[in-house]
């Protein structure tokens, strides 16, 4: 959750009025609230007919002494929420935003169920157990004949804390058994500087030193196992390896990290486990690239987490963590509960949690099956490659992510090479395994020619078209580079890729036109901007030409002729 500071309404409103008065006195006008004629700018305004029910204004920052009719409250909330972005067009988020009618019914019909109450909801508890088994099987715990165990969580952030705690407790037990201190110098955990904040939270919240492996262009902005192994010592409780970086979608190399740790153990006798942060990748990679070995097939991987509400295709609030066997989940972390009607075992950071998202995950697994998830995953990857290629063909952008890169020849099989030779480039096995994420930035040539254009302006201009595309700095040691990022999720079709690309190129060229326009020299008066006159003269012609160019670029990246893009106009 985002932390929110308590707002003292009277104090804030007083300061706001004083600020407006002071700020606007320099401009010679009255405060905004006075111009609007608002006597109570700190109050919510209800429907004009609501005064028949009300005895006082509706407070924003404190509980009103009187309520209001349900319809009025509903209208007030929905009107405020209308200013939120459209979840489907929120390309910043990895979180799934749409389920079908029957999933919605399951969510609605089971919204009152508490997952912790297993005695009251035995069928729900059974479904939870089945999900743990299904995930363990998907991640090949069965292949290793392991007695896997796990639990549902509210998401990967909680799952990461649980996995980290298990590794810390096992490290402490080992230190005690060896007669060594577990307090000085204390435990450490290793992760890339590209780690999502939940991984850093574990270290800070549970007093573990976070050793951040520097990342840069040479490491593809993810953790390099060779750099990570240099930070390992006897106090390392484990290594977080990320299957799908938040920044670029790139997978970290689980197999290579395990190999180096095997060598380290052979030399020192110190056994250091791996936890795979598969928040996104653990429910994408098994379907998109099942030949990729990253899971429990690697003996050093002791636990894996994932978010069902990402590529598991459920609404937010669904996550899981699985341990390869019971010995990697210390008994002292598991609580035995006797006050819910039966004996229950729990390992979580909170007690109550909604059952509905977990039931929706079960429905999604049943409804899609492996084939359905694979079909969606392949479509997501194809659309991500389409967008990435189009961006690079535009000559304005360089794509940092790797979803569209062919594998290094040394990593290709004979079949892969044969497919590449005959031009069968739609096979995902030919490409570098990665999430369907497109991270990109201005090319060096573009920056040289248009030095005053800020990349952040693209984010703001796209928002005018309702697209939510973040512009952010890369991790420490690479923070001088900013990237824009698009996450391709289910429902983001090829047509939507075309529409996004069209808008992106148009706003880019809009900024280019503004950059080229020369302002009048001092002493020439307040003449009009050159580009404004040009736009008035042939605006329709320029827009038509621009859209045609966009269509040609996208079609070229897709291997087809130019196609009509009539949907770009208003219906």
Language-model features, listed with the residues they occupy:
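Conserved PLP-enzyme active-site core in the AAT-like
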Residues: 2, 9, 32, 37-40, ...
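Non-catalytic terminal extensions of PLP-dependent enzymes
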Residues: 1-144, 165-166, 171, 175, ...
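Secondary-structure capping and boundary motifs in well-ordered enzyme cores
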Residues: 123, 152-159, 191, 195, ...
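Structured loops at beta-to-helix junctions and adjacent beta-edge loops in soluble globular domains
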Residues: 80, 94, 192-194, 242, ...
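A short glycine/serine-rich beta->alpha loop
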Residues: 59-60, 115-119, 145-154, 306-308, ...
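Alpha-helical scaffold segments in soluble metabolic enzymes
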Residues: 130, 134, 162, 166, ...
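A short small-residue
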Residues: 107-114, 237, 241, 360-367, ...
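Active-site C-terminal subdomain of aminotransferase-like
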Residues: 286-436, 440-446
């Amino acid at each position: 959750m985002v932390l929110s500071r308590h707002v003292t309404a009277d104090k804030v409103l007083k300061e706001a009025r004083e600020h407006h008065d002071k700020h606007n006195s320099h401009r010679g006008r009255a405060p905004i609230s006075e111009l609007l004629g608002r006597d109570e700018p700190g109050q919510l305004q209800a429907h004009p007919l609501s005064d028949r029910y009300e005895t006082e204004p509706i407070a924003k920052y404190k509980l009103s002494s009187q309520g209001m009719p349900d319809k009025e409250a509903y209208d007030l909330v929905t009107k405020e929420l209308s200013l939120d972005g459209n979840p489907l067009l929120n390309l910043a988020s990895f979180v799934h935003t749409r389920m079908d009618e029957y999933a919605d019914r399951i969510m609605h019909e089971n919204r009152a169920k508490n997952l912790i109450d297993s005695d009251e909801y035995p069928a729900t508890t059974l479904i939870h157990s089945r999900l743990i088994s299904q995930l363990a099987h998907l991640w090949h715990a069965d292949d290793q004949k392991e007695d896997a165990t796990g639990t549902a969580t509210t998401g990967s952030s909680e799952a990461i804390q649980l996995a980290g705690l298990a590794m810390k407790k096992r490290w402490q037990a080992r230190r005690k058994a060896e007669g060594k201190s577990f307090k000085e110098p204390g435990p450490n955990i290793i992760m890339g500087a590209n780690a999502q904040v939940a991984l850093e939270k574990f270290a800070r919240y549970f007093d573990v030193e976070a050793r951040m492996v520097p990342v840069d262009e040479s490491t593809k902005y993810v953790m390099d196992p060779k750099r990570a192994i240099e930070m390992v010592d006897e106090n390392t409780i484990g290594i977080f390896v990320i299957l799908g970086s938040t920044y670029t979608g790139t997978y970290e190399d689980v197999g290579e990290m395990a190999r180096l740790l095997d060598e380290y153990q052979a030399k020192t006798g110190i056994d250091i486990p791996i936890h795979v942060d598969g928040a996104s990748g653990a429910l994408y990679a098994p379907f998109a690239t099942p030949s990729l070995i990253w899971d429990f097939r690697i003996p050093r991987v002791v636990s894996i987490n994932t978010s069902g509400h990402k590529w598991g295709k459920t609404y937010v609030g669904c996550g899981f963590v699985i341990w390869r066997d019971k010995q990697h989940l210390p008994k002292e972390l598991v609580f035995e509960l006797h006050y819910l009607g039966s004996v229950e075992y729990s390992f979580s950071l909170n007690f109550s949690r909604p059952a509905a998202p977990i039931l929706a995950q079960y429905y999604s697994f049943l409804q899609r099956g492996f084939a359905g998830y694979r079909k969606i995953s392949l479509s997501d990857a194809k659309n991500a490659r389409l967008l990435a290629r189009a961006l690079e063909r535009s000559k304005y952008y360089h794509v940092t992510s790797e979803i569209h890169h062919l594998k290094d020849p040394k990593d290709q099989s004979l079949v892969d090479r044969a497919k590449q030779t005959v031009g069968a480039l739609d096979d995902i096995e030919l490409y570098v395994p990665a999430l369907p994420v497109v991270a990109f930035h201005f090319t060096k040539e573009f920056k040289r020619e248009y030095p005053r254009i800020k990349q952040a302006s693209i984010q703001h201009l796209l928002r005018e078209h309702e697209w939510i595309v973040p512009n952010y700095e890369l991790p420490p040691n690479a923070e001088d580079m900013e990237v824009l990022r698009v996450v391709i999720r289910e429902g983001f079709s090829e047509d939507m890729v075309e529409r996004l690309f069209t808008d992106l190129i148009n706003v880019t060229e809009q900024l280019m036109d503004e950059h080229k326009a020369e302002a009048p020299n001092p002493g020439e008066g307040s003449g009009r901007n050159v580009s404004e006159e040009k736009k008035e003269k042939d605006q329709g012609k320029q827009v038509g030409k621009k859209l045609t160019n966009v269509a040609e670029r996208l079609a070229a990246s897709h291997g087809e002729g130019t196609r009509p893009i009539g949907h770009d106009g208003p219906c």
